[in-house]
From Swiss-Prot:
Protein name: Elongation factor Ts
Sample GO molecular function, one term: translation elongation factor activity
GO cellular component, one term: cytoplasm
HAMAP family: EF_Ts
Keyword Cell inner membrane included in the entry's annotation: no
Entry's localization field: Cytoplasm
Keyword presence, Protein biosynthesis: yes
Annotated function: Associates with the EF-Tu.GDP complex and induces the exchange of GDP to GTP. It remains bound to the aminoacyl-tRNA.EF-Tu.GTP complex up to the GTP hydrolysis stage on the ribosome.
Region (Involved in Mg(2+) ion dislocation from EF-Tu): 78-81
Pfam families: EF_TS (PF00889)
Major location (coarse): cytoplasm
Domain of life (superkingdom): Bacteria
Amino acid sequence: MVDAEKIKKLREMTDSGFLDCKKALEATKNDLNAAVKWLQENGKAKAAKKADRITAEGLVAAFSNDKYGVIIEINSETDFVAKNQKFKDLVNKIGQELLKHDFYKYKNIIEEVKIGNETLAELVASASATIGEKLTFRRAEQVKKFNSKQVIGVYNHFDGQKAAVLIIENGTEDMAKQLSMHITAMNPLFLDEKEVPEKEIKKLRSEFEKDEQIQLKPEKIRPKIIEGMINKKLSETTFTLQEFVVEPGQSIKQYMNSKNSFPISKIRYEVGEGIEKQVVDFASEVANQMKNKA
């Protein structure tokens, strides 16, 4: 017979459901430590069954200390789970742990870094079993300060769907935070003009040369018009050329020059970037379930 007090204790230790704890204790003859292990193994089995499900929701979050800036994305199947406090705590726990490590020392930091006895990947798999939905640790990146003049800024949008981390040189923490907020809002593709690939400029030039409206202009002035259009496009996609949302009328470059500052590196994440969300036909799904039960 299962000890009710041990069920309560096991639930407190693992956050697992009542029935799962009861099964674990039955399977291990009321041995708490063995029951914890049973739940972990069973949780991984459950996670494996969920492996083919698409995880396009979730949270992104940026963290920083006096040396590193870290940004991570952990995905879930539904936005409902993304709002779950246990899921938020998991994201925060992993982010804070990653601030202790230099990413360059690892081949696969998600599989190598541990919290307690579990790797980060195993921790997410265990949480998947507890929360009851497939979770995926999709990605993590780090920026690193190389001198005392450099400052890290992070910004997390209130909904947890967008975040950014930035390093600047010769600036304040408040300035770095405002600039990282700009990156979160405006999503620049490139840090500065030097980072814009030549193939991007060639691509834009080719597109504008084929533009019917430009073809109607006199041939002599077309190159100048095209250069102007390229510069306008780059001012929309390049961080230093964008208009600063906090100081309208000034570009980021002008603002930073006035502070004798310049950007070093940036990373921006948005939940589900590049993931094709699964579109579910509810009527068909119900019909298939009824068919399988028949």
